Amino acid sequence: MPESLMVIRSSSTLRKHWEWMTFSADSVSSVHTLTDDLPLESLADQPGAGNVHLLIPPEGLLYRSLTLPNAKYKLTAQTLQWLAEETLPDNTQDWHWTVVDKQNESVEVIGIQSEKLSRYLERLHTAGLNVTRVLPDGCYLPWEVDSWTLVNQQTSWLIRSAAHAFNELDEHWLQHLAAQFPPENMLCYGVVPHGVAAANPLIQHPEIPSLSLYSADIAFQRYDMLHGIFRKQKTVSKSGKWLARLAVSCLVLAILSFVGSRSIALWHTLKIEDQLQQQQQETWQRYFPQIKRTHNFRFYFKQQLAQQYPEAVPLLYHLQTLLLEHPELQLMEANYSQKQKSLTLKMSAKSEANIDRFCELTQSWLPMEKTEKDPVSGVWTVRNSGK
């Protein structure tokens, strides 16, 4: 290892504290917890403060499997945004995407809101820490095909359920996930919760801090979100700055000359582009009046990307977050089928208005509707047909 390294693990909704540890050529520190007496700024004097790997909790990330038009399709920040746009819970936000795997026309990506990533980087920069890599928390957990890896964190469980799928759930939601999608194999650090089991015998290890599984010898480069507009610029010398300014000045003069000689042709081109854009929009409105779109009409006509039905882990996270915010609702039973595109919940509530409010709050990510109430138990059935 060429230099000291510090790994910082951000807090999450279920785990309120930050953690950190350091690596050097001849030693590895234990896992430490930040407190009011030991804030983030106190790490600026520690070894590795100039080479920080930041771990972001899975709750702030999106995982998507995308299909390209063809194997040679050029992937850029813009084309990734187009491909993922129909699957976003809120397409008004600007998302930053990282390709973690590509097999022919199939692409696995991880997304984070650009504003959120900027806040993370600004916070560590203000604390005097130099971030050189940003990774999803959980990417360092050991994993094998058709298996889960679980780490007990006292208040929650850190989970790696697939090659590029990481999440953090409390015990209640972990039990729901395991009941609906039991894995073939399971590796567990800590005592496995009651009702969580795999098809094959459990591989059990003593409980340890999840961060202690991080390895400084593994690059984790495929998961690094510090790229594109977030990539750090190298320092430029004074002579380099002067040459850069000269080059920019020459380029500006060349552009002005080109614009001056081609202004009429450019004006006609822009006018034609506006006409074509308006024609495409009119055609889109004629065929798809219920879907509002303002750009990239040809791409969506060709691909006709439909809203994907949510995968189990992010769906459970949405439900978990919603129920934590509304204690007047209690989940009694959940039945989920991604194949049949259906979700059925049995819920109890203080009043029917609480159930109506729950259905209203789910409209942005998975519309739910109440169907019936058990006259004896008072339990409501809420479902989504997936159609």
Swiss-Prot record:
Ranges of the Cytoplasmic topological domain: 1-241
Protein location: Cell inner membrane
Induction field: Silenced by the DNA-binding protein H-NS under standard growth conditions.
UniProt-listed Pfam families: GspL_C, T2SSL
Coiled-coil blocks: none
Listed GO CC annotations: Gram-negative-bacterium-type cell wall; plasma membrane; type II protein secretion system complex
Record topology, Periplasmic segments: 261-387
Record keywords: Cell inner membrane, Cell membrane, Membrane, Protein transport, Transmembrane, Transmembrane helix, Transport
GO process annotations (BP): protein secretion by the type II secretion system
InterPro entries, per database record: ATPase_NBD, GspL_cyto_dom, GspL_pp_dom, T2SS_protein-GspL
Transmembrane segments: 242-260
Family, as annotated: Belongs to the GSP L family.
Quaternary assembly: Type II secretion system is composed of four main components: the outer membrane complex, the inner membrane complex, the cytoplasmic secretion ATPase and the periplasm-spanning pseudopilus. Forms homodimers. Interacts with GspM. Interacts with GspE and GspF.
Miscellaneous field: Part of a cryptic operon that encodes proteins involved in type II secretion machinery in other organisms, but is not expressed in strain K12.
Name this polypeptide is given: Putative type II secretion system protein L
Lineage per the UniProt record: Bacteria, Pseudomonadati, Pseudomonadota, Gammaproteobacteria, Enterobacterales
